[in-house]
């Protein structure tokens, strides 16, 4: 096979259908838009969610919930990720960022108790779950809320 013998796979290339170019084309006159009406006009058509004047679904359904403006979003760190540090290390948000464990600190760091901690560490973070606090202290480490 040579370069000039290459051909696209059968049916992979189709010619664009040019509508409104004479009745003999099969897509002339109304150009696939049917007879008159809103959808036949240029720029015609109804807006998203419009149901012909009937109250649309999004307005028939009740509103639900709200967004709490006081919500704080914490960056989560689990115990098994803290195992990569050496014994006796002081783990701070800066150290976590440098290690690539946390990309965005958000409202602070919260330590959760997923996995097991085997190292003795001093962990400094904004929040700790109760079980994470117990696990860190059980491993001989200490916590500090900052």
From Swiss-Prot:
Q: Which GO terms describe its cellular component?
A: cytosolic large ribosomal subunit
Keyword list, A-Z? Ribonucleoprotein, Ribosomal protein, RNA-binding, rRNA-binding
Q: Which domain of life is it from?
A: Bacteria
State any GO BP term from the record. translation
Under PROSITE patterns, the record lists: RIBOSOMAL_L15
Q: Where is the composition biased (Gly residues)?
A: 23-35, 42-51
Q: Where is this region: Disordered?
A: 1-51
GO MF terms listed in the record are: rRNA binding; structural constituent of ribosome
Where in the sequence does UniProt note compositional bias of the Basic and acidic residues kind?
1-10
Record-linked SUPFAM superfamilies: Ribosomal proteins L15p and L18e (SSF52080)
Q: Which NCBIfam families match?
A: rplO_bact
| Role description | Binds to the 23S rRNA.
Q: How does it assemble?
A: Part of the 50S ribosomal subunit.
Family according to the record: Belongs to the universal ribosomal protein uL15 family.
| Xref: PANTHER family | 50S RIBOSOMAL PROTEIN L15, LARGE RIBOSOMAL SUBUNIT PROTEIN UL15M
Protein name per Swiss-Prot or TrEMBL = Large ribosomal subunit protein uL15
Annotated gene: rplO
